[in-house]
Amino acid sequence: RRSGLKVECRVKGFADFGAVEWVLNFKNLSDANSATIEQVKVVDLNLTSPGEGGFTVHYADGSHVSKADFHQRTKVLAPGDSLYMAPEGGRSSQNAFPFFNIEAPDGRGAMVAVGWSGTWFADVAAGTKGGVALSAGQKNLSAYLYPSEAIRTPSVCLLFWQGENRFAGHNAFRRFILAHHTRKIDGKPARYPVSTSFNYGDPAPCNEYTCLTTDYAIALIRRYEQFDIVPEVFWLDAGWYEQAADYKNQKNWANTVGNWKVDRERFPDGLKPVADEVHRVGAKFMVWFEPERVVKGSQWAVEHPEWMVDVGADQYLFDLGNPEAREWMCDYIGDFIEQSGIDYYRQDFNMEPAWFWAKNDEPGRAGIREIRHIEGLYAFWDYLLE
């Protein structure tokens, strides 16, 4: 009996680096809800080696918001040992890192990358007779699909290497990313620019986030010009929007996101005059945004409550999984960037989305909210690059 469920694996190989990457897509072609899709392992394979000794996994912690962020870790897998990795809170590098190196005892190995800006998992388990089993995918998925509904999984990339030590793999993977997954400008990999902020420090509350004005920003730009130290980019950080400067009423940059209108008391003509001055001295202009998090009572929350994913907290998650909401966000931020003369878009995300997804999943459809949000996030970024 046919289930009506179509499973497609899109694969791309890179012969110049001995690498391969793929992603799975599921689509329900039937007229009824599909059976439950769960325990999906986008990669599920065994790695073996003729060498003596155990396999070693080189990995990193991810971010703990500490000085030890992305600390390097190494685990030698004895027979029966395993290493399970997964981020916390719904952000892909929170307490775990989706890139790691499996080193065999014979001078070979595989670099592994899991492409998913949500909650992924990866497991490396050593067998009792040698070799290791590798599996990875979306951590929380147990859902049926509606008729004609389709979803994608995380992607996986494997790069096989051979050399004296693990650094052969690290360096090969770095070159691979530069060659095939780095944005090109005039045929060359885009470089991170040397940038500076408009922050002039404390005493709080008068710092960039509350007291910066058009006049002060322009004066600061001219000061850099005077001393011939103009950077490649001037970076305007958080707090340029309405209510962020109202510290007398306990407002600040963090509890006013969702008010994506320029504070006209500090920037009476918007951000364009600042951008014009930045461009006059030969630099580019970068501006900070955090569109996924929306504080209750803010502009976006009031104007579009139907697009707010709610868990009863003091903030919402913007519903990027809603095509209408995503299209509106694309137009709003895209128009703002063009009208304000912004060259570089900087995106932040200061919340854990996992519980917003989980609490708003329909019964029997765990993981769908996460998938739709990540798909929408990628579509939004694609729009900005067009």
Which residues are covered by each model-predicted region?
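Short Pro-Gly-centered flexible turn/kink motifs
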Residues: 143-162
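Active-site beta-loop-alpha junctions enriched in small/polar residues
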Residues: 117, 158, 198-200, 234, ...
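Active-site neighborhood of glycoside hydrolase catalytic domains
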Residues: 263-281, 297-386
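An acidic-aromatic substrate-binding cleft motif
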Residues: 166-233, 237-242
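Polysaccharide-binding surfaces and accessory modules of carbohydrate-active proteins
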Residues: 1-130, 139-141
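Catalytic cores of extracellular degradative/oxidative enzymes
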Residues: 218-233, 238-284, 291-293, 298-303, ...
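Hydrophobic faces of well-ordered beta-strands that scaffold small-molecule active sites
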Residues: 154, 191-196, 232-236, 285-289, ...
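Conserved, mostly hydrophobic/aromatic
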Residues: 24, 148, 195, 234, ...
